[in-house]
Amino acid sequence: MPTELTDYDPSMGNKFIFVTGGVMSGLGKGITAASTGRLLANAGFDVTAVKIDPYLNVDAGTMNPYQHGEVYVLKDGGEVDLDLGNYERFLDIDMTFDHNITTGKTYRHVIEKERAGDYLGKTVQIIPHVTDDIKRRIREAAEGHDVCIIEVGGTVGDIEGMPYLEALRQFAHEEDDDDILFTHVTLVPYSKNGEQKTKPTQHSVKELRSIGLQPDILVGRCEDKLDIEAKEKIALFCDVPMDAVFSNPDVEDIYHVPLMVEEEGLDQYVMEQLGLDERALPPEERANEWRDIVTQETTDEVDIALVGKYAMEDAYLSIYESLKHAGFETNTDVNVLWVDADEMDDAHADRLSRADGIIVPGGFGSRGTEGKIEAITYARENDVPFLGLCLGFQMAVVEYARNVCGLDGAHSAEIDDETDHPVIDILPEQYEVEDMGGTMRLGAHETDIEAGTLAHELYADEQCTERHRHRYEVNPEYIETLESAGLVFSGQDQNRMEILELPDHPFFFGTQFHPEFRSRPGRASPPFVGLVETILETTDTDTEEVTA
């Protein structure tokens, strides 16, 4: 594996697609990139992806979900941007922390090398030392794959993104022309008179070209498909062929985007430009499972309450997506009802009472915990199907300890370090940990599943491997008390409790791990499928009756 620029040989055979964005952030670069990758994978190519995040954080682990959405956890324990979750779901691959490049990670590595004397007294600068490190990371992530898609976070013109765009300019200079493709995603808004305006796209491309990058493909994010006049203007003023201008209009479900851009011919154009068309599978032999999965008709509809503290979908994105996947598997429309755990007022309580099932997700801190416990009590006492994830698992233990075991004031030591009954306590290996970033119990761990339990029925195996992100666990001193009162810990990692359930309840299931991070279209997470299937078995959910 090459470790420095001078070791690199362009003949290694990788193809690189760089995806940049203009006009504004949050346009959907990641979904555009992931959809392109999905279509190339359908054509028989081994595709991977890299997300560049130009912030100074080393990783996303300490970021506020209000600002950046959920922290997505990889198999190797990397805490990363939620876009990597979309890549894993669309491409059906397991990525690594090396597939996320941040400014903090890059600068730290360069500074460590300088301190170690690796630069032999040279003046360490953005060019060439930082840009060389960026290029090295991209090439190492791409090794062994046919195609690597690299998304550059942020918007062209952002000052923090400049070193990355310069690295890309150098990258293109070092590679063969038919091994590199630049895709630029921009906003094409409507004017008040209904005309699609291309000026923002023109200015965005002008900014990109001033850095030395010329896009090969332009993708217009718009409410509706680009009309011919808009395409002609974009092609003329941005200096790209008409055939290289594609639409990416709004859709109700992101899983339809690959089908839409396939109709536009984006995948075929990409393969032709990269010289991949002759190696691609014939259209009649390409995988159609994706289309079959995401376009199937639904026969049922369910409402599931999500009881959390972050009132935005991106903060719990993988849970929303996992419910979609469970819906694909059961031919069910799954509606999510947001319930604010911090304000369990009459409106939210009514929403909870109308729900067919309840999910209490992961999280940190004291805010909203009593509301979550209240929701768990409601689910347990009223036989409402319930799924608790990470903190939701822990709060289910707290609720049971208080209301069934009679342990007044029982709580998690994270929330109340003076409780008389710390049924949830800090992991022993965390006692001496002081740093916050990257120090939790992270990544994939195996769980042994007890035969004859709901967990065994769901996973259909004696063991499962799921991803974790936590510092606290069930206190071993209270396990006997909890079990003697009827709570079953059906999954364990040695002496650590990983799964809980109540045998006499239709579906009361909690996991210390995050099963949502391994769910995929066509391969939905077992706990989510179990939740939806139980609702269908115990509730009248016919779509026509619900609509009526």
Swiss-Prot record:
Which residues are in the Glutamine amidotransferase type-1 domain? Answer: 303-541
What is the activity regulation comment for this entry?
Allosterically activated by GTP, when glutamine is the substrate; GTP has no effect on the reaction when ammonia is the substrate. The allosteric effector GTP functions by stabilizing the protein conformation that binds the tetrahedral intermediate(s) formed during glutamine hydrolysis. Inhibited by the product CTP, via allosteric rather than competitive inhibition.
EC no. given is 6.3.4.2
Could you mention a single GO BP entry for this protein? Answer: 'de novo' CTP biosynthetic process
Q: Which residues of this protein are catalytic?
A: 390, 514, 516
SUPFAM superfamilies attached to this UniProt entry: Class I glutamine amidotransferase-like (SSF52317), P-loop containing nucleoside triphosphate hydrolases (SSF52540)
Q: Which InterPro entries match?
A: Class_I_gatase-like, CTP_synthase, CTP_synthase_N, GATASE, GATase1_CTP_Synthase, P-loop_NTPase
Residue positions binding Mg(2+)? 83, 151
Residues holding CTP: 25, 158-160, 197-202, 233
Q: In which pathway does it act?
A: Pyrimidine metabolism; CTP biosynthesis via de novo pathway; CTP from UDP: step 2/2
Record-level Gene Ontology MF annotations: ATP binding; CTP synthase activity; glutaminase activity; identical protein binding; metal ion binding
Q: Give the binding site residues for L-glutamine.
A: 66, 363, 391-394, 414, 471
**Sequence positions that bind ATP:** 26-31, 83
Q: Which reaction(s) are listed as its catalytic activity? A: UTP + L-glutamine + ATP + H2O = CTP + L-glutamate + ADP + phosphate + 2 H(+); L-glutamine + H2O = L-glutamate + NH4(+); UTP + NH4(+) + ATP = CTP + ADP + phosphate + 2 H(+)
- Region Amidoligase domain, residue ranges: 1-276
What does the similarity note say? Belongs to the CTP synthase family.
Tell me what else is known. CTPSs have evolved a hybrid strategy for distinguishing between UTP and CTP. The overlapping regions of the product feedback inhibitory and substrate sites recognize a common feature in both compounds, the triphosphate moiety. To differentiate isosteric substrate and product pyrimidine rings, an additional pocket far from the expected kinase/ligase catalytic site, specifically recognizes the cytosine and ribose portions of the product inhibitor.
Quaternary structure per UniProt?
Answer: Homotetramer.
Function as written in the Swiss-Prot or TrEMBL entry? Catalyzes the ATP-dependent amination of UTP to CTP with either L-glutamine or ammonia as the source of nitrogen. Regulates intracellular CTP levels through interactions with the four ribonucleotide triphosphates.
Family matches, as NCBIfam families = PRK05380.1, PyrG
Q: What is this protein called?
A: CTP synthase
Please name the gene that encodes this protein.
Answer: pyrG
